[in-house]
Amino acid sequence: MSLQRPNGNSSSSSSHKKHKTEESDEELLMVPDMEAAGSTCVLSSSADDGVNNPELDQTQNGVSTAKRRRGRNPVDKEYRSLKRLLRNRVSAQQARERKKVYVSDLESRANELQNNNDQLEEKISTLTNENTMLRKMLINTRPKTDDNH
């Protein structure tokens, strides 16, 4: 009963690689969780050798080396680093997209505020001119008082 490792050499993995190039971007970003499969593959493949294995003996004595060696397996390390790298790439791309949306919102808001400011300045100028004109009219329409009276 031998199980293959996650990136073991087989004809199915080569056909999987061909199929993987045809997948969409969304499918490429999804990473299957193979951590448990990788650790069981190591134990079951070593059990098939028929050789007295100290790891297998310790496991039979009740000491679980699978959990202890789980992080040390080079296949698992490579898988985890690739998985982390993929997550980081996706996260960075999402952050860039959020930043683009944020910056474009800021730019449109700045344009709106600038237009509003221009309109208000024009209104201030118009009202100031009107106020000045009305004051002059008020002065001209007042009856002149004679001091000689």
UniProtKB/Swiss-Prot annotation:
Please, which domain of life does this record's source organism belong to? Eukaryota
The GO biological-process annotations, alphabetized, read as: positive regulation of transcription by RNA polymerase II; red, far-red light phototransduction; response to UV-B
In residue numbers, the region (Interaction with COP1) covers: 23-36
> Could you describe the post-translational modifications of this protein?
Ubiquitinated by COP1. Ubiquitination takes place in darkness and leads to its subsequent degradation, thereby preventing the activation of photomorphogenesis signals.
**Region annotation (Disordered) ranges:** 1-77
What Pfam families does the annotation carry?
Answer: bZIP_1
What does the UniProt record say this protein does?
Transcription factor that promotes photomorphogenesis in light. Acts downstream of the light receptor network and directly affects transcription of light-induced genes. Specifically involved in the blue light specific pathway, suggesting that it participates in transmission of cryptochromes (CRY1 and CRY2) signals to downstream responses. In darkness, its degradation prevents the activation of light-induced genes.
Family to which the UniProt record says this protein belongs:
Belongs to the bZIP family.
State the name under which the record lists this protein: Transcription factor HY5-like
